Design a protein with these regions (language model features):
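Solvent-exposed interaction patches of small proteins and small membrane subunits
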Residues: 1-121
Length: 121
């Protein structure tokens, strides 16, 4: 059963993921990595998303088993790496693979289990 905090975190995850999808729509890897402003905003949203994913309680994670919890747990420290190849790879992988899959499954869960996203006492 999700708590109020977990529901809020799921909403935050969805919002940050949607922001990343909008910001990166149509961008190639090189374009994203060259664009200081877009890159900075995308990285900020990814850090919010990854950090929020790590804070969701184990019981709530169990209710959304298709989300790649371990993948986000592993990606989180890489998104906080100093500028360089590790960060570039993490940034692009998150944008191309992790975010789309996460948003897809969140949409499915929101349709089939809306109570997971309901922030009510």
């Amino acid at each position: 059963m999700t708590t109020l905090i977990d529901s809020a975190l799921l909403g935050l995850i969805e919002e940050a993921g949607t922001a990343v999808a909008i910001l990166t729509e149509g961008l190639e890897r090189a374009e994203l990595l060259r664009s200081r402003l877009t890159r900075a905003q995308v990285l900020q949203q990814l850090k919010t998303l990854a950090s929020s994913m790590t804070q969701v309680a184990p019981a709530a994670r169990g209710e959304l088993p298709e989300l790649d919890w371990l993948g986000w747990d592993a990606l989180n420290p890489r998104l906080n790496a100093p500028p360089g190849e590790v960060l570039d790879e993490a940034l692009w992988f998150a944008c191309e693979a992790m975010v789309p899959a996460t948003l897809l499954w969140l949409r499915v869960y929101r349709q089939n289990q809306p109570e997971l996203f309901r922030m009510a006492l």
